[in-house]
Regions:
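Basic, alpha-helical nucleic-acid-binding regions used in initiation and control of genome expression
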Residues: 3-15, 19-25, 29-31, 36-100
Length: 100
């Protein structure tokens, strides 16, 4: 579970840095697909609300767009994408520790 917590932190960080919202939505939906439990859907709703408020729309609309993005890729690509993001997070944390 820790890996996905790291990815969620990465999501919020990327969103705050104003990286493409489509990428954030996509990664959020990847996590939501992997963990369909209630806790994750609450986190995803908060993320969708944050994106929606910035674009003057509803969180449901953001969720719908995110789901459409996910449908465009196969499950294998979905897993590869999450794995690549996890590796990036791990490398960044290692760099941070080495710099201290």
């Amino acid at each position: 579970m820790r890996l996905y917590e790291d990815i969620l932190i990465y999501l919020y960080t990327e969103y705050e840095m104003n990286i493409t919202n489509k990428g954030v939505q996509y990664l959020a939906e990847c996590i939501a697909e992997v963990y369909k439990d209630r806790i994750w859907s609450v986190h995803m709703t908060y993320l969708y609300e944050a994106i929606a408020s910035r674009h003057d729309t509803t969180w449901k609309n953001v969720e719908r767009l995110a789901r459409q993005e996910v449908k465009k890729v196969s499950n294998n690509k979905l897993g590869e994408f999450i794995l690549r993001q996890a590796i990036i997070i791990k490398q960044n944390k290692k760099k941070e520790r080495n710099e201290k």
